[in-house]
């Protein structure tokens, strides 16, 4: 065997085929004699001696490359050749078909120069000429590399294209769900970066030919659209008002306190829309296009009141200039159209009044429907509560220290809430004593409600007597507002004291407390309305006499003017608006009462927070060191946030706004300012002055209980306004409906004058009582049917939940009891005559083989009866005989022997099992 050179041996060891230029003449002849032994696999022709054949051999066949390729090359023509992945089969790699470019050629030429006596007959000059020819031909062929790569990409089969598409989709899913992976952050970032690089590199390769650029453009636009939606969602979340404040409160005081501020924010949004409707369609048109102040009597302060119209005491009572302003009903003119736009102000006033209730009703019902499904389908929350909170509560993407502190406080509070729920579920009680105490508590609360209603009715009657008296004190002027505010302040505290007898769960106790305070506020409000309507009826009687007197006064004025100026044939000058006789304008009187009630409620609420919370916390904080007892642990201690009182205060105040907005359009703006200031003021108070409740509890996942109270008071607030519109006659000298029999007549006037005749006929048919009653009955039947269907669906869902829970429990028991440790169950299993066979485990197979060879007896499992084979030993609790049994041994190092399921793979220090 001829001896090979060192260079040849090294090149063959690494799998590089030796070309004719490298070998010497003798080796070239010997290689020819061996019949092309160095040709890999015989599939490729012998390498030629010139550079052109060598370059062609460097490129693999296109067909084989397309068949063996798993990942396509980049599709862009601008990509370099280094980016094209080299795909070769395993057989070609074993045969040494991998060739080097560029640097390999330089190494070959360098090694040729160092060979000395084994040079070729052509010499150095010929070798250098050949190398230069190779470089020139490579440059000529470099222009065709890009077209060759494109042809190779286009030669991908449909299966490879589908496989690549699946891989790209999998990477996209991984990118979308990377947060849900239980990995460390370093691994998440690494996997995310790799997936993004893979998608960016191969997503454009899914197009073909001319459609590739269009596909790449679509992919780019899709990415930009997804990024835009994500940024817009972040922007919309950032635009939610007071989100950070509410989250901070929730983290320290629990979800129950945060639910109040969420409800307050929702109320602010709804009132902002009502404010836009009222000011945009009523107040601003009257200010811009209506008659100015002082032009007519309803817009002018009477002459006898002008001297005191700007006094502070008068303005705080909303008299003087406040009474004759756009804040109240009486300021608006009854002209059918105003301004150059011919704006129909009376119709707009009525439609806005009705639309306020319509929009509020729609928003409340929609919110309740949206929250109805919140909290459904969360069966896992009822099991392993503390395990879920322990292992899934923390957010590992938090990077802010303040956010981490809030999250820590929130998790701590949620654990306290769950502990309270667990304690309430396990509490034992004396049922008879509990029933007696609850009946007693309800009796005391009923007496309190009745007494507060009688007190308000008595005060309203007394205030009517004060109106005819002069030189009243401040208390006598504001007695009604003071009594109602004090009842709203003292009543909830009294109810909370009585509720201690009942010992309800905190969440249930909160609902009872809310219901009782709601009954107190609603009773007070309706008592106030009944007493107020008695005053309205008295003013209507007074208005008739004043109307007759004003007509007589006008006739007397014209007669006196004609008598005093007999030569004047012109029209007499109009009466000065300040000197005209005024009616009582009962709508403005009602509006003033509602505004005063709202302002007094705001004052009492803010003073209560300032004195009852801030001053109390100040005393406890700074006087505790020099006091006789511990002020923090004993009396007075820090205050707790009164959820029920504050929620019912909001609901009660909103009911007054709905009722009074028709008589005082400016009341909606006052309420918006109140809610805006309450958010900042109460957030500061609760964070600075209050402490969390001793019994922290979770709020309901939806605020539907609050919404239910709001819906009820909305309906009850609608009744007085509808009664006013349809039944009571408007004042004759103030307001947009003056001069009409009923306020609703403005709609009939618009239909008769502005719409075609058939519209009036159609509206008359629609307003027919028979049709209205039929429609109402149909709606009631539809509601009953839908409610029945909803109850049926709810029962079906509950049954399905029970079945799913039973199936989950059964599967859990079956999995846990596969290898029963109960001796009685084992004895019962041994006595069963017929059992389904199970395939033997690998250990049993090895034991049987050893028994067949060595003649040893088969091992008998402890506890099994005689004559029962080990293969037939099946647990009663196992439904699947092929299921793997649980691990019943203690964890520890595995001994010598094969792994389970791998008889030939030894593990440990012992030898592997003997092979047959």
From Swiss-Prot:
It comes from the Eukaryota. It comes from Danio rerio (Zebrafish). The keyword Transport applies. The keyword Cell membrane applies. GO terms for molecular function: calcium channel activity; mechanosensitive monoatomic ion channel activity. Residues 31-45, 62-72, 108-117 have a biased composition (Basic residues). Residues 883-892 have a biased composition (Low complexity). Residues 14-26, 145-157 have a biased composition (Acidic residues). Keywords: Cell membrane, Ion channel, Ion transport, Membrane, Transmembrane, Transmembrane helix, Transport. It is a multi-pass membrane protein. Pore-forming subunit of the mechanotransducer (MET) non-selective cation channel complex located at tips of hair-cell stereocilia. Highly permeable to calcium and likely transports monovalent cations. Residues 1-13, 97-107, 118-138, 804-818 have a biased composition (Basic and acidic residues). Signal peptide: none annotated. Residues 1-271, 366-438, 500-516, 671-704, 784-916 are cytoplasmic. It is found in: Cell membrane. This is Transmembrane channel-like protein 2-A. It holds the Pfam family TMC. Belongs to the TMC family. GO terms for cellular component: plasma membrane. The gene is tmc2a. PANTHER family: TRANSMEMBRANE CHANNEL-LIKE PROTEIN 2, TRANSMEMBRANE CHANNEL-RELATED. It catalyses: Ca(2+)(in) = Ca(2+)(out). Interacts (via N-terminus) with both isoforms CD1 and CD3 of PCDH15A (via cytoplasmic domain); this interaction is required for mechanotransduction of the hair cells and correct localization of PCDH15A in hair bundles of the hair cells. Residues 1-159, 804-916 are annotated as: Disordered. GO terms for biological process: cellular response to mechanical stimulus; detection of mechanical stimulus involved in sensory perception of sound; inner ear receptor cell development; lateral line development; vestibular reflex. In adults, expression is restricted to the hair cells of inner ear and lateral line organ. Expressed at higher levels in the larval inner ear than in the lateral-line neuromasts. Residues 293-344, 460-478, 538-649, 726-762 are extracellular. The chain crosses the membrane at residues 272-292, 345-365, 439-459, 479-499, 517-537, 650-670, 705-725, 763-783.
């Amino acid at each position: 065997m001829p001896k090979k050179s060192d260079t040849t041996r090294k090149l063959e060891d690494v799998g590089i085929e030796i070309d004719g230029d490298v070998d010497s003449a003798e080796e070239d002849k010997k290689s020819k004699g061996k019949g092309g032994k160095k040709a890999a696999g015989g599939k490729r022709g012998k390498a030629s001696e010139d550079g052109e054949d060598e370059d062609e051999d460097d490129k693999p066949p296109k067909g084989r490359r397309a068949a063996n390729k798993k990942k396509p090359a980049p599709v862009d023509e601008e990509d370099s050749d280094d980016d094209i992945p080299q795909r070769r089969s395993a057989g070609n790699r074993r045969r040494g078909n991998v060739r080097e470019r560029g640097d390999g050629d330089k190494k070959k030429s360098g090694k040729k120069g160092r060979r000395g006596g084994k040079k070729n007959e052509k010499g150095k000059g010929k070798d250098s000429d050949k190398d230069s020819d190779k470089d020139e031909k490579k440059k000529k062929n470099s222009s065709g590399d890009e077209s060759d790569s494109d042809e190779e990409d286009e030669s991908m089969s449909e299966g490879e294209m589908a496989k690549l598409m699946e891989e790209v989709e999998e990477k996209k899913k991984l990118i979308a769900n990377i947060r849900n992976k239980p990995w460390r952050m370093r691994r998440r970032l690494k996997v995310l970066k790799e997936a993004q690089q893979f998608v960016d590199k191969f997503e454009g390769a899914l197009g073909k030919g001319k459609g590739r650029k269009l596909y790449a453009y679509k992919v780019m636009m899709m990415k930009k659209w997804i990024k835009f939606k994500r940024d817009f969602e972040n922007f919309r979340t950032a635009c939610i008002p007071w989100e950070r404040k509410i989250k901070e409160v929730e983290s320290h005081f629990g979800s129950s306190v945060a639910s109040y501020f969420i409800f307050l924010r929702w109320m602010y949004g709804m009132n902002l829309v009502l404010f836009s409707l009222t000011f945009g369609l009523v107040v601003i048109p009257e200010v811009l296009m209506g008659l100015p102040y002082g032009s007519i009597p309803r817009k002018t302060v009477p002459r006898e009141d002008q001297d005191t119209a700007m006094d502070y005491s008068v303005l705080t009572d909303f008299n003087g200039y406040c009474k004759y302003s756009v804040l109240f009903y009486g300021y608006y003119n009854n002209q059918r159209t105003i301004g150059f736009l011919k704006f129909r102000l009376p119709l707009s006033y009525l439609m806005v009044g009705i639309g306020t209730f319509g929009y509020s009703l729609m928003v409340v019902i929609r919110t309740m429907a949206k929250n109805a499904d919140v909290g459904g389908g969360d069966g896992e929350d009822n099991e392993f509560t503390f395990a879920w909170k322990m292992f899934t509560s923390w957010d590992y993407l938090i990077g802010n220290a303040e956010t981490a502190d809030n999250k820590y406080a929130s998790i701590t509070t949620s654990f306290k809430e769950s502990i309270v729920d667990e304690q309430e579920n396990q509490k034992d009680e004396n049922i008879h004593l509990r029933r007696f105490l609850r009946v007693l508590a309800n009796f005391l609360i009923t007496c309190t409600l009745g007494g507060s209603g009688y007190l308000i009715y008595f005060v309203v009657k007394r205030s009517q007597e004060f109106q005819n008296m002069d030189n009243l004190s401040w208390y006598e002027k504001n007695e009604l507002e003071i009594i109602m505010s004090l009842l709203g302040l003292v009543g909830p505290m009294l109810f909370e004291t009585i509720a201690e007898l009942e010992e309800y769960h905190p969440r249930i106790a909160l609902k009872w407390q809310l219901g009782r305070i709601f009954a107190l506020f609603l009773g007070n409000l309706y008592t106030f309305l009944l007493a107020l309507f008695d005053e309205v009826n008295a003013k209507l009687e007074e208005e008739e006499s004043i109307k007759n007197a004003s007509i007589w006064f006008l006739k007397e004025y014209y007669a006196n003017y004609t008598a005093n100026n007999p030569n004047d044939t012109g029209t007499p000058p109009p009466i000065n608006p300040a000197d005209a006789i005024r009616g009582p304008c009962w709508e403005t009187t009602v509006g003033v009462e509602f505004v005063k009630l709202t302002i007094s409620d705001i004052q009492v609420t803010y003073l209560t927070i300032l004195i009852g919370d801030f001053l109390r916390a100040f005393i406890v904080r700074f006087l505790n060191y020099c006091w006789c007892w511990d002020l923090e642990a004993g009396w007075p201690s820090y205050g707790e946030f009164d959820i029920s009182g504050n929620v019912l205060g909001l609901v009660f105040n909103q009911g007054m706004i709905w009722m009074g907005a028709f008589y005082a359009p400016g009341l909606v703006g006052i309420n918006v300012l109140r809610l805006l200031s309450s958010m900042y003021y109460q957030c500061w108070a609760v964070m600075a002055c209050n402490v969390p409740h001793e019994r922290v509890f979770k709020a309901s996942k939806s605020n539907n209980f609050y919404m239910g109270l709001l819906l009820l008071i909305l309906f009850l607030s609608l009744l007085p306004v509808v009664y006013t519109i349809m039944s009571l006659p408007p004042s004759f000298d103030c307001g947009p409906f003056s001069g009409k029999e009923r306020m609703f007549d403005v709609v009939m006037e618009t239909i008769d004058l502005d719409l075609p005749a058939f519209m009036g006929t159609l509206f008359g048919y629609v307003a027919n009582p028979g049709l209205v009653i039929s429609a109402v009955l149909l709606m009631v039947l539809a509601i009953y049917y839908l409610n029945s269907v909803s109850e049926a669906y709810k029962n079906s869902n509950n049954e399905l939940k029970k079945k799913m829970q039973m199936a989950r429990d059964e599967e859990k028991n079956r999995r846990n009891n596969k290898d029963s440790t109960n001796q009685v169950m084992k004895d019962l299993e041994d006595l069963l005559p017929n059992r389904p066979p199970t395939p033997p485990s690998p250990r049993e197979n090895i034991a049987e083989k050893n028994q067949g060879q060595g003649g040893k007896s088969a091992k008998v499992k402890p506890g099994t009866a005689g004559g029962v084979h080990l293969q037939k030993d099946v647990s009663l609790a196992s439904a699947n005989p092929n299921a793997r049994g649980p691990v019943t041994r203690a964890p520890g190092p595995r001994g010598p022997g094969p792994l389970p399921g791998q008889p030939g793979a030894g593990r440990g220090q012992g030898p592997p099992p003997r092979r047959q």
